[in-house]
From Swiss-Prot:
Its main location: membrane. May be heterogeneously N-glycosylated in some cell types. The lineage of its organism: Eukaryota, Metazoa, Chordata, Craniata, Vertebrata. Residues 1-22 form the signal peptide. Gene3D superfamilies: Mannose-Binding Protein A, subunit A (3.10.100.10). This is CD302 antigen.
Length: 232
């Protein structure tokens, strides 16, 4: 009974410890550096890139933005091995005609790019960007897409979760330490219980009544009485 009750006691503590260190919204998200990523594999028909973006905002995120070579490589590797995405992924980028530059939908700074070609003379109105999975390069394309085979979303880890206060760290440490202590204590109690049970079982048999005769003594039965005969 003790062994059966112990997991039920430890599970809430383990859940609390896991919640204390979890950074992404759920296990379906993947963390890299200070952000969480999810690939929505559902193919949808859209009228504009805003319809694609709504897929991400419905999950509390925005379309993907990429800010360094390491992040670009992480996305490529995860798309190939885990997400199994299409050959081209629509990036969360648009061309702003007001200042003639590309910008991210999530309002982050454009600190990195990986364009496969640069043509200053091309018309960039209604131009979006796509990540080519095989090469890892970006290419320009029309924003007026009719359908997408999957949407890649990204959200930043909240500041208050990324930099836990000292109290939260202490609570997490205490929860984990308590879990370990209870596990060890439960194992010790179970061991002592089993040892006590085995000892009592042995004592019962060791105190059972013994025959008053030894191996050299036989019982001779007469016609009227019984008496032991001892052989020398």
């Amino acid at each position: 009974m003790l062994r059966a009750a112990l997991p039920a006691l430890l599970l809430p503590l383990l859940g609390l410890a896991a919640a204390a260190v979890a950074d992404c919204p759920s296990s379906t998200w993947i963390q890299f550096q200070d952000s969480c990523y999810i690939f929505l594999q559902e193919a949808i028909k859209v009228e504009s890139i805003e319809d694609v973006r709504n897929q991400c905002t419905d999950h509390g995120a925005d379309m993907i933005s990429i800010h360094n070579e390491e992040e670009n490589a992480f996305i490529l590797d995860t798309l190939k091995k885990q997400w199994k995405g299409p050959d081209d992924i629509l990036l969360g980028m648009f061309y702003d005609t007001d200042d003639a530059s590309f910008k991210w939908f999530d309002n982050s700074n454009m600190t990195f790019d990986k364009w496969t070609d640069q043509d200053d003379d091309e018309d960039l109105v209604d131009t979006c960007a796509f990540l080519h999975i095989k090469t890892g390069e970006w290419k320009k394309g029309n924003c007026e897409v009719s359908s997408v085979e999957g949407t890649l979303c990204k959200t930043a880890i909240p500041y208050k979760r990324k930099y836990l206060s000292d109290n939260h760290i202490l609570i997490s440490a205490l929860v984990i330490a308590s879990t370990v202590i209870l596990t060890v204590l439960g194992a010790i109690i179970w061991f002592l219980y089993k040892k006590h049970s085995d000892s009592r079982f042995t004592t019962v048999f060791s105190t059972a009544p013994q025959s008053p005769y030894n191996e050299d003594c036989v019982l001779v039965v007469g016609e009227e009485n019984e008496y032991p005969v001892q052989f020398d």
